[in-house]
Amino acid sequence: MEIQSEKLALMAGDGNADAYRALLERHYDLMYRVAYRTLGQQADAEDLVQEICTSLPKKLSSFKGDSKFESWLYRVVVNAGRDLMRKRGAQARAADGWGDVEVMQREAADETTENTRWLAHAMSRLSPELRETVALVLGEEMTHKAAGQALGLSEGSVSWRMSEVKKELRQMAMDEEMLQ
C-alpha cells in the first residue's frame, strides 16, 4: 500500500530521509514540468529543481498537511521560479521554450507544427503571471480552483487570467492576420 504524499511530506519534514527520497521519486517530474513551463528554458528548469531539492527539506517543516501536497509543491515551484526570474532579470526570455515538447510531438504534421510554433512564440510574449497560470491550467490540466490554490489566488482570479490569455492571444493573431 502506497503512503500518501501528505503523510510522506510530514514525515520528511520531521527529518525522515526515506520519506524525503520517496517524495522526490514521486514528484521530481512534476517539479521539472512546472519549472520548465514557467521558465521556458531547460537549463533554468533543471537549476531551479536542483535548488528546490536542496531547500525542500527545510521548507517541508512548513507543510502542515492542511492541503494536498501537490498543491503546496506547485506553489513552492512557482514561487521559486518567480524568485529566479527576478534575480536573473530574465522575464524577457522566460518562455522561449514554451511549447517545445508539444512542437516535438507534432513535428509530423506541418500545419499543426506551424500553429504550435506560433502559439509557443505568442506564449513567450505573455506576462510571467499569465504564463504561470497557463502552465498550471493547460500544461498540468489543473482546475481553476486548484491552480488558484497553488498560486495563492482566488478561483475567480485564475478565471480572469485565463480570459486575459485568450484575449491577448486573439489580439496577437488578429495583429498577425492569422484570424480571417
Where are these regions (language model features)?
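DNA-recognition helix of helix-turn-helix
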Residues: 78, 82, 130, 139, ...
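N-terminal module of bacterial RNA polymerase sigma factors
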Residues: 1-30, 37, 121, 171, ...
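Short, Lys/Arg-enriched C-terminal cap helix and immediately downstream tail that follows
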Residues: 64, 86-89, 126, 131, ...
